């Protein structure tokens, strides 16, 4: 078990989610507001906003919170956030990409650098690790919509590059350029996805021992706890034994 799905499942284990739910809601609301402000407040015409709303629903964010975040984008006195990316290294030479939204670059850079340093990592220059990742689209469906063969056939026909299917559902990966077309084709067949968006996917993953793995997970948790941080992407894989321990 390795890669993006493994990491996502670990970071969303129950205890972790319960402990940071209010902070998660705040970050989701910010992304919804930013997406609505950059485009149209109509999710049918704004793919980024639609993806943000799906992410909020997946976390059981109340409908009122979602609608309030969209309306906030129309306010003249609302904060102006910009997207920014940081790159760095963790224990064992693992690579990390951090996506943040900030209204103060200096504050966010200082917070992210401190998070790296406190947990045995180091912040690097932009471009230092991005070449190890691909910017791709991901469209996720629950396992109940189709069996693995049916989803694979539909995804390839739609122009996707890869499909991962299991008990947790189906995760379709496609090139960034074909993200819109693939999403539309899959929706026509299976309905609205559970989750969709653009991510940084590691081209290759490195295996780390359990001691290093625990340090890396701690590093990611510290980074994710920063208010301005939206997503963290990694290129390491953990042993099945450590995964089971972390999910217990």
UniProtKB/Swiss-Prot annotation:
Main subcellular localisation: cytoplasm
One matching Pfam family: TACO1_YebC_N
InterPro entries to which the protein is assigned, alphabetical: Integrase-like_N, TACO1_YebC-like_2nd/3rd_dom, TACO1_YebC_N, Transcrip_reg_TACO1-like, Transcrip_reg_TACO1-like_dom3, YebC-like
GO annotation terms (biological process): regulation of DNA-templated transcription
GO molecular function, one term: DNA binding
Subcellular localization, as worded in the UniProt entry: Cytoplasm
Superkingdom of the organism of origin: Bacteria
Keyword NAD on entry: no
Keywords per UniProt: Cytoplasm, DNA-binding, Transcription, Transcription regulation
Entry keyword Translocase: no
Annotated Gene3D superfamilies: 1.10.10.200, 3.30.70.980
One GO location term (cellular component): cytosol
Family matches, as HAMAP family: Transcrip_reg_TACO1
Cross-referenced NCBIfam families: PRK00110.1, PRK12378.1, YebC/PmpR family DNA-binding transcriptional regulator
Assigned protein family: Belongs to the TACO1 family.
Entry protein name: Probable transcriptional regulatory protein Mrad2831_3553
């Amino acid at each position: 078990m390795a890669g993006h799905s493994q990491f996502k499942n670990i970071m969303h284990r129950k205890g972790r989610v319960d402990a940071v739910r209010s902070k998660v809601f705040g970050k989701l609301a910010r992304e919804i507001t930013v997406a609505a402000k950059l485009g149209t407040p109509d999710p049918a015409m704004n793919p980024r906003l639609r993806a943000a709303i799906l992410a909020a629903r997946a976390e059981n964010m109340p409908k009122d919170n979602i609608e309030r975040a969209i309306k906030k984008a129309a306010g003249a006195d609302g904060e102006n956030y910009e997207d920014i990316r940081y790159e760095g290294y963790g224990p064992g030479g693992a690579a990390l990409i951090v996506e943040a939204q900030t209204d103060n670059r200096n504050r966010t850079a200082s917070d992210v650098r401190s998070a790296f340093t406190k947990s045995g990592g180091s912040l690097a220059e932009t471009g230092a690790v991005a070449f190890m990742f691909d910017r791709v689209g991901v469209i996720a469906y629950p396992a109940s919509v189709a069996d693995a063969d049916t989803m694979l056939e539909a995804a390839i026909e739609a122009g996707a590059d890869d499909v991962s299917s299991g008990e947790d559902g189906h995760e379709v990966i496609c090139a960034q350029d074909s993200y819109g077309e693939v999403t539309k084709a899959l929706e026509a067949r299976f309905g609205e996805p559970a989750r969709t968006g653009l991510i940084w996917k590691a081209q290759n993953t490195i295996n780390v021992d359990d001691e290093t793995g625990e340090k890396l997970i701690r590093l990611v948790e510290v980074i994710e706890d920063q208010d301005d941080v939206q997503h963290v992407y990694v290129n390491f894989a953990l042993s099945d034994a450590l995964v089971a321990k972390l999910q217990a």
